[in-house]
A protein has these predicted regions:
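Sec-dependent N-terminal signal peptides
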Residues: 3-12
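N-terminal "domain-start" segment that seeds a small globular fold
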Residues: 15-40
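Conserved redox-active cysteine motifs that mediate thiol-disulfide chemistry
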Residues: 44, 52-69
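Hydrophobic beta-strand anchors of alpha/beta hydrolase catalytic cores
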Residues: 49-50, 80, 132
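Structural microenvironment flanking redox-active thiols in thiol-disulfide oxidoreductases
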Residues: 61-101, 112-117
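Short, internal strand/loop/helix patches
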Residues: 96-131, 135-137
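Thiol-/selenol-based redox modules, centered on thioredoxin-like
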Residues: 129-174
Length: 174
């Protein structure tokens, strides 16, 4: 019975992740809180973790703490970039960064970059946050995770580290 439950749990996690993966990561150049531009091309050759957030989202706040641990664990092996979407403004982001002791770049997006990552369109404008994208050194999205019940371990537990370890070892799903 535990075996069947385990298979079902794995199947649910796989079905809830990766639907936006396997394609070239859309390029961008976005400003951070201090006005410095961050271009995705500058991170070519290393694993990049992008999370799309809103500072008022409780799951995004929880993820910020997890990403701080990811940055501490992996150092230069993994670049962590957060992208905030409207209605976040400079004051909200400054408060968020200070409140979570964030050292990695938090970038401002007017919505176009996040829409290209999430494949949002006028016909399908739904954007769920947080959403994490894992990008390999060649610029391909290898996996992505939107926050759902069956992906909570990615956002709250060690699941994200396992996915990063898999990608660093060259064993990504796509």
């Amino acid at each position: 019975m535990r075996y069947v439950f385990g298979l079902l749990a794995c199947a649910a996690l796989l079905s809830a992740s990766g639907e936006l993966s396997g394609r070239r990561a859309p390029g961008f150049s976005l400003p951070d809180l201090h006005g410095q531009q961050h271009d995705l091309q500058d991170y070519r050759g290393k694993v990049v973790l992008i999370d799309i957030i809103q500072t008022t989202c409780p799951h995004c706040q929880q993820l910020a703490d997890v990403l701080g641990k990811v940055e501490a664990k992996y150092g230069d092996k993994v670049a962590v970039l957060s992208i905030t979407i409207p209605p976040d403004n400079q004051n909200a982001v400054a408060h968020f960064v200070a409140g979570h002791s964030i050292a990695y770049p938090v970038l401002f997006d007017c919505g176009q970059v996040s829409a290209s990552y999430l494949k949002a369109t006028p016909q399908n404008p739904k954007v769920n946050v947080p959403h994490v994208f894992l990008i390999d050194g060649q610029g391909t999205i290898r996996n992505d995770f939107g926050y759902e019940f069956n992906t909570r371990n990615i956002f709250e537990g060690d699941g994200l580290n396992l996915e990063i370890d898999r990608l660093l070892a060259g064993k990504s799903k796509k």
